[in-house]
Amino acid sequence: MVNYLARLTPYIFLLGLLVALSLLASKIAHELVGLEGSILSLPKAAAFYPWEVPALAIVCLALALLISWRVDVNEFSIHYLYRNRLVRCYLGASVENRKPQPFTGFSDADDVPLARLQIPATGTDGVDDRPLPILNTTLNVVRGKELGLQTRKARSFPFTPLCVGFTRPDPASSDLESYFAPASILGADRPDSKNGVRLGTATAISGAAVSPNMGFYSAPDLSFLMTVFDVRLGWWLANPAGAIKKWRIGSPTIGFYWLLRELFGATTDDSEYLYLSDGGHFENLGIYELVRRRCKIIVACDASGDALYGCGDLHNAMGRCRVDFGAEIEITADEIGKITPAGAPPRAMAHFATGLIHYTPGNPADDGIFIYVKPALQASDSADLLGYSRTNPAFPHDSTVDQWFDESHFENYRALGEAAGRAALGSIRNAIGALLTIPMGPVAPLPATPVPNKEFVG
């Protein structure tokens, strides 16, 4: 009974909200025209202003269309607030000789076009060893026609410096349809993205965890409530399968219709514009797109706040890769047991687990190496880390809702990440050496004295 009441609560709230807004509108109308009597007296009201009500509705609709034409549907949300803070905190901190705007603290130089990170072609006598960033987002398909999406309600939608887009099964064959368009011209007709979509925008979409449509977490009542109260971090983007003119604009010209689709959870993958949200609404570890590219070494860091060590995100990624690519990620229960704390106080035997990725059945030469890092404390960790965990029981699995870490909280997470990274580095180097048939040296020890940064911009 309690579960049913919990499910009904959002709908009861919505009904009450609509009734309250209707009564408020009726009260305002009564005051404007000087109508006497109860606001619930509908016959009197209808007799007093039979044409004013439809006229007022038409005026309100016209005003809504005008505003949605002049104000971008993506700007009418908290997305830009979130994006600006991410850019200011992380990208701005790496800019030398930064010259921010005095009042806001922001700078145009903080953000860069995503296409600028593209690895250039090199000659035979040179190799560019920069990493290729892949920013994973979720294409919401809450109302999709494909039966295979009834549970997922989403597809993977990666951003790379070269192109942006998605793939889906071709209903007429066993092949995949690919819809990708250049990142360098996405939104190029807009004054704030003349060189294509910016890194900060793609990063903010990739982290848009709070959205009315959230992949397999989507629910009609939640979509309605979050849209009404404008709790929206997601992004409406032109479909890369559509006209290049719309791709250059990037977002809907008139956003009212698309806002209604967001309100009612009517997102699809074959409309003119697509609704994107946090990549974790499809697959939270970032493994999926790497397996698609058949990477030989994949390092996944699971910071999902999994205090019970159920590894739900890992199991989800393993299932998606198996179903979509036929790739089997093999990681034994013993390996998972090493990173699962036990005893009193609970301590793990390792910071990471290792496994194999079988890309081609029966062909070990195609196998990849999988290294899975998960926050856990070992008895051999530093005394300050172990001491901090005794006074902060949630560490190292604080909820992501907590966005207000103090200095000690931040530093202990950083120190744990460094310890886990150094622990896994030996296995990573050995894996690279095995692939390249080159012996790799030992991992360098921690420096005796940390080298301070020139400047920290928080």
Where are the predicted features?
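Patatin-like phospholipase A catalytic core
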Residues: 1-458
